[in-house]
Amino acid sequence: MTAVDAPDILDYDEVLTKYEPVMGMEVHVELGTATKMFCPCPTEFGAEPNTQVCPVCLGMPGSLPVVNAAAVESAIRIGLALNCSITPWGRFARKNYFYPDQPKNYQISQYDEPIATEGYLDVILDDGTTWRVDIERAHMEEDTGKSLHVGGATGRIHGASHSLLDYNRAGVPLVEIVTKTIHGAGERAPEVARAYVTALRDLLKSLDVSDVRMDQGSMRCDANISLMPIGAKELGTRTETKNVNSLKSVEVAVRYEMRRQAAVLDAGGEVIQETRHFQEADGTTAAGRRKETAEDYRYFPEPDLEPVAPSAEWVEELRGTLPELPWIRRARIQKDWGISDEVMRDLVNAGAIDLVIATTEAGASPEAARSWWLSYLSQQANTRGVELGALPITPAQVAQVVALIDSGKLNNKVARQVVDHVLDGEGDPEQVVAAHPELVVERDETKLKAAVDEALAANPDIADKIRSGKVQAAGKIVGDVMKATRGQADAARVKELVIEACS
């Protein structure tokens, strides 16, 4: 068979009638240590290029690495939280390959003796069912530098006039978490992939080992996808999709790659084993480099580092430091708040649990906090194309908005305008209200009564209906008053005044 381009991607439902998707997820997590994996260079995000480097992370001759103990501790805690076995004897290995963002021409990683093996993570799908994802391994390694390709239309090396290299990230501690083969998901494969990355992110956040900012690259997901013809016994050729930088993108990338591979196979071609880059703009994947095998990397034990041999006592001590893990916390919160499985599922799917908890801790009621994060703020996140937690508003600021509503200074409609100003960087809600007094709820009874009288005079037929006992007709008058006051009136008080005026 020859490699051919697909004439077009297949309809997703058609794919499922012919092929069974098989997945494997690789998630790289930058650990939140103060220094790099093998040297004392800082790990601050956003520093000037090439200002956080030294002879060790630049691979200068004669420099020797020293293992970051805090990174090893974080890796063990991750393994324990993933129900893994922690190795009593692990070694680092050199992964040999040439690429400009790897200054040593090899990466210090772990190969056949990783820190953690044989675990699992139970994830919740959209309908509330649980899917168990088996973990093959979690291993420690150092991150690479960053390449910036200049002059091309796509930001990739193809077509670029030149490339710039920033080695600040080179040597930052990583834990790579690799799943076993995920099969049997069928049409839900993209959903399972997204749910897994969501659950893993929440777990890592609860451990406080990383800020897991996908938008900043501190959590990066690679999705390995292949298709098996239904009834076949042999696995298909896999591709590895990279550059998947959001939870939504995980699902979109897996779905697209399934459709693309199916089209290639239906056209009589063969899927090439390669890396592919996810294109956020249109939800497609583009070909990268041919995918190497483990043999191509010529792994061998790192001669400059001793094995990592955590004692059983130390491992148990670290087990005792694990916090309340997400699934335990969810059960407790659901009981404490008295919410349904459906509401809890919405909170999980939106990634809003921590945000709601923090908002309640800042003074808002659980009901108000949930309402804001699951409704208006979720809409704003979708509009801006960011994750909910990346919105430029804090739980404390949301709690301030709730307090302003409870005090009667704002109504729900105007409160949304205040939130918009906060999202635009105009300060805390109290500062926004001070700068925009027109947003404060109108409390002058004389003005409100005048507006009510004017609306009733303009609608005598509705006034007659209200006088005859059809109180529901007051809604039209209330709406006119709200329009006249530009939404600043308290709708409940306006309705009271309308009924009083017609009695």
From Swiss-Prot:
Keywords from the UniProt entry: ATP-binding, Ligase, Nucleotide-binding, Protein biosynthesis
SUPFAM superfamilies, alphabetized:
GatB/YqeY motif, Glutamine synthetase/guanido kinase
Enzyme class, top EC level, equals ligase
ATP-binding found in the keyword field: yes
Name the catalysed reactions.
L-glutamyl-tRNA(Gln) + L-glutamine + ATP + H2O = L-glutaminyl-tRNA(Gln) + L-glutamate + ADP + phosphate + H(+); L-aspartyl-tRNA(Asn) + L-glutamine + ATP + H2O = L-asparaginyl-tRNA(Asn) + L-glutamate + ADP + phosphate + 2 H(+)
Per the UniProt entry, the Enzyme Commission number(s) are: 6.3.5.-
Which molecular-function annotation in GO is an example for this chain? Answer: asparaginyl-tRNA synthase (glutamine-hydrolyzing) activity
Lyase among the record's keywords?
A: no
A single Gene Ontology biological process assigned to it is: glutaminyl-tRNAGln biosynthesis via transamidation
InterPro entries cross-referenced by the UniProt entry: Asn/Gln-tRNA_amidoTrfase_suB/E (IPR017959), Asn/Gln-tRNA_Trfase_suB/E_cat (IPR006075), Asn/Gln_amidotransferase (IPR018027), Asn/Gln_tRNA_amidoTrase-B-like (IPR003789), GatB (IPR004413), GatB_Yqey_C_2 (IPR023168), Gln_synth/guanido_kin_cat_dom (IPR014746)
UniProt similarity note? Belongs to the GatB/GatE family. GatB subfamily.
What this chain does, per the entry, is described as:
Allows the formation of correctly charged Asn-tRNA(Asn) or Gln-tRNA(Gln) through the transamidation of misacylated Asp-tRNA(Asn) or Glu-tRNA(Gln) in organisms which lack either or both of asparaginyl-tRNA or glutaminyl-tRNA synthetases. The reaction takes place in the presence of glutamine and ATP through an activated phospho-Asp-tRNA(Asn) or phospho-Glu-tRNA(Gln).
Listed name of the protein: Aspartyl/glutamyl-tRNA(Asn/Gln) amidotransferase subunit B
Native source organism of the sequence: Rhodococcus erythropolis (strain PR4 / NBRC 100887)
Q: Species lineage, top-down?
A: Bacteria, Bacillati, Actinomycetota, Actinomycetes, Mycobacteriales
